[in-house]
Structure formats: structure tokens, C-alpha cells
Amino acid sequence: MEKAFREPAFPRIVKVYFEAYGCTQNYGEARLMQQALSSRGHAIVPSPAEADTSVLVTCTVIDHTERKMLKRMHVLAGEGKPLVVAGCMAAAQRDLVRRTVPGARLLPPRKWPQIVELLGAGTARGDRAVAMEADHAAWRDAIVPIAQGCAGRCTYCITRVARGRVSSYPVDAIVDRVRGYVEAEIKDVKLTGQDTAAYGMDGGTSLPALLRAVTGIAGDFRIRVGMMDPLTALPILDDLIDAYASPKVYKFLHLPVQSGDDGILEAMKREYAVADFERILAGFRAAFPEITISTDVIVGFPGETDDAFARTIDLVRRVRPDMVNVTRFSARAGTPAATMAGQVVGWRAKERSRRLSRLRFRIAREIHAGYVGRTLDVLTTEPGKAGTTLGRTDSYKQVVLPSEEPIGDWRTARIVEGREADLVGELI
């Protein structure tokens, strides 16, 4: 049983527990909130039992995730301490959150800088990128949100309801933030957003311009560019490929196709064709033959016939992505797709998911087998399991090294095994 929710006055120093789920942007915004609080002398604690208040940064992309979020709300509210529900549910499902935890405070994604004011711990500084003193010691990488929202109107997506249209943070603010991380000797920097290729379309700049500004920072570091949509990547393709040529940019492209059938893409309102997706991949691969390609596919979208799914299978066989994130369609209340005709029964969507997953694992094993015997430079990024260290190559391949190595150093490794998700290397 949950304890009675109390609304105590906060002490002068607030102890705050954070819990985040979902996309990289959610984790990035959770870190920014922590930095905002810690820079004002407040304490970030590792458990809700130690906290004066808890902040839950929510994701609601599919119904399974939503159920998990509701459970976590109950558990955290059961501590009998103030709860802040942030992230997408705080914007897209406010009524549901209020019914679930009536005493919780809601902090939508675009309002994250107001965390300080919300906790009575100081004054918020607005709804744009904020220059703050940061304690970087707790993190081995940097997550830098570059924008809110997206340019699309996908019929299945509840995230757009939560985050709205594109609102880009200023180039100078992003550069200053990245420079701060680099000066703190963080070498693995992730630029994130719902659609990074949409960056700047609301303010007369662009993702390539941002990349050139960020890679102009002095230092030895790597930039991973986050997910981008074919819709917004295609108009800037040549300029984007040129910006990717910097040795400071990981040769990694996350480009969700969602379906290999043009009819399904039209029903999704993705606003591009399969041929556009293939053109983007061809351009990047021509410039960077070893680039790592990641894509996303939704199976079981309303109206997806066996023939439509077969075209998705054919596309994956044809373009051979290094990674395919497979998701079964999840009807989200309030989205057009939730009430479309031709809903695919669960068992059929599950079977399609399994079939596509088998294909993607086979392709990944075949690609990674081709690395065995090669010698690669690896940037160490995080500790692994059982005394190992994880690292990334310039094409963002994950390599498992056999010993504990300092994080942020370069190592040379000979690849001895290629697995579905990573490579195994030995130091030389």
C-alpha cells in the first residue's frame, strides 16, 4: 500500500533522486536537470529512500513502456515524498498521470529548466539551452540535446504530442556545452533530438552547420549524431555527408525507415518513399564505405499485408543494415493509427517480428565476421562485464576488450570474434 502523499516544505539543500527511461534525449534532459540542481548546491542521491523528492523522466512510446511508467509512479509515490513526473507522459498524458499519482507535479519536456523553480530550490532560467556549471565526473559520455520536437506528422507517434514542432537550441549554446565536456576530458559526445536532421529548420541554420561548429572545438573527441528521419535528411544530404567527413564525427547513421512498403509509409505519413531511404544510404556508403547503418522498423502497422511485410524483408536483405531495431505496432490513444482499419492481430505481428529479427541477427553476424583478423583503433567508453572494457571504433562498432582499461583512451585491438551485437578484440 502506498504511503500517504505529503507536501513538506523543502529544506534549504534539496536531495533529489532521478530515474529516467526511453530515448537518449530523455537521459540527456535528466542529466541537465541534475546539473541545474547540483550547480546550485543541491544533492543528487542514488536512491529514493535518501531523497527529499524524486523525479521520474517518463517514456510512453509504446503501451508496454507506459505500463512500466505507471508502475514506477506508484512505487515512487509510495515513498510518501513529493514526486515530479517529467518526460513525455507529463505532456502527452497529463490526465492519466494525475489519476495515477494525484499529488505529483508535472514537468513537460519543454519545461525541464523549471526543475529548480519547481522544487523551490532557486529560479529557472527559461526554456532554451542553458549555460550551467556542470559536475561531469559522474558520466563517462556526454549527451547534448540539440532541439525539441520534430518536423513530421506520423500517424502512430505520441512523442510528437509530447514534444511538439521543431525548436532548435542556439548553435553557440550547444558549442559551449560540448566544449565544457571536452575540457572535462569527456571524449564520447552524443548529439540528440527526436530528429537531428531537422535541427535549425526553424531558425535559419542546419545540422551540417552545427556539426562544423562542434567539430571546430579543439580536442580529441568523437561526436555521435543521433537519429534522423529520411524526410529531413534528404534535402541536406550532400552538405550532411560533407560535414560527416570530419574525423571527429563517428561514421554512424541512425536512419529509421519504418517499412519497406511505400503504401505503409504513406499510411504512416512518413512523407518519403523507400527509394529516398535507399538514396540516402547509397550516398553515405559511397563517401564512407565502412559506415555503420542503424534503422528502425515497425511491424504489424494497420493495413500491413503479407506482401507489404515481404517488401520490408526484401529491403533489409537488399540494404543490409548493421542494426535493425524491430518494434511491433502499438496503438497509442489519440493517434490516428490507433483507429485505422486493418489492425493486424497480435500473433501475426509477433511472427513477423521474429522473422525480421532472425534476418537482422544473421546479417549482423555476417557483417561482423568480416572484421575478424583486422586491426582497429578503439576509443574506450565504459567498463564492461567481468573485467572487460567496451570501446568504439571510428565507425561506432562496439568492441569488447579483455582487460580493464582507462576510459577515454585509445587502444589498438585485433578483432578475434564477430558477434551479433559487437566485436571481440585482443590488445596489441
Residue locations for each model-derived region?
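Conserved, mostly hydrophobic/aromatic
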Residues: 174, 191, 225, 255, ...
